């Protein structure tokens, strides 16, 4: 039913920005099987279809963005282990920092001090909109934020998208993706993922 409600948002239909269209078409909704999908599916057989689909998206995003650091906030150990493997499959040289649900504030310091491209991976049920807004403000041009499990806490996403300027955001139902760039006009795309 979710897929049908977003049928008009398939494969980048209606997106005028060449950059955003390319990201949707070749990163978010890429259907070509990447080199590590099969191995990772064997390594994590307990992952359901949605978590496997999300993991494959993480691999493609890391492959595209080549972040120097990923900061994961609010996940349990099992989720972090699986997500770390998918992100690392896309960018083997990245540094990984995992922060539990109760320790979200140190992530803000980590994001503000580290050089290079960052990717913040946040669990929507474990954070609030105020914290996420502050985290995005500390990021630099070219950084990404993945708000995972968005379907469990839509209010956080809606509040962040409403508050922030100079972002391009993609609502993919299961997760949200924010790209930080002060030179771009604010855009929010709904994607059939």
Residue ranges and their predicted role:
Residues 1-140, 150-193:
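A short alpha-helical cap/connector motif
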Residues 143:
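Glycine-centered, small-residue-biased loops immediately flanking beta-strands
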Residues 146:
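Feature for secretory/organellar precursors and membrane-associated catalytic proteins
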């Amino acid at each position: 039913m979710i897929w049908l409600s977003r049928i008009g948002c398939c494969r980048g239909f209606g997106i005028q920005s060449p950059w955003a269209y390319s990201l949707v078409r070749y990163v978010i909704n890429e259907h070509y099987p990447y080199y590590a999908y099969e191995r990772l599916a064997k390594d994590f057989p307990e992952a359901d279809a949605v978590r496997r689909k999300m993991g494959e998206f993480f691999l493609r995003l890391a492959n595209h963005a080549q972040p120097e650091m990923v900061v994961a906030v609010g996940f349990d150990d099992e989720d972090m282990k699986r997500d770390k493997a998918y992100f690392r499959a896309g960018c083997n040289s990245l540094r990984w920092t995992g922060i539990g649900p109760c320790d979200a504030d140190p992530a803000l310091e980590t994001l503000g001090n580290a050089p290079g491209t960052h990717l913040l991976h946040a669990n929507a049920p474990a954070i609030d909109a105020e914290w996420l807004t502050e985290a995005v403000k500390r990021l630099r041009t070219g950084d990404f934020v993945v708000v995972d499990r968005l379907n469990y806490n839509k209010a956080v996403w809606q509040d962040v998208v409403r508050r922030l300027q100079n972002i391009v955001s993609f609502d993919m139902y299961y997760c949200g993706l924010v790209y930080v760039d002060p030179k771009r006009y604010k855009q929010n795309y709904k994607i059939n993922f």
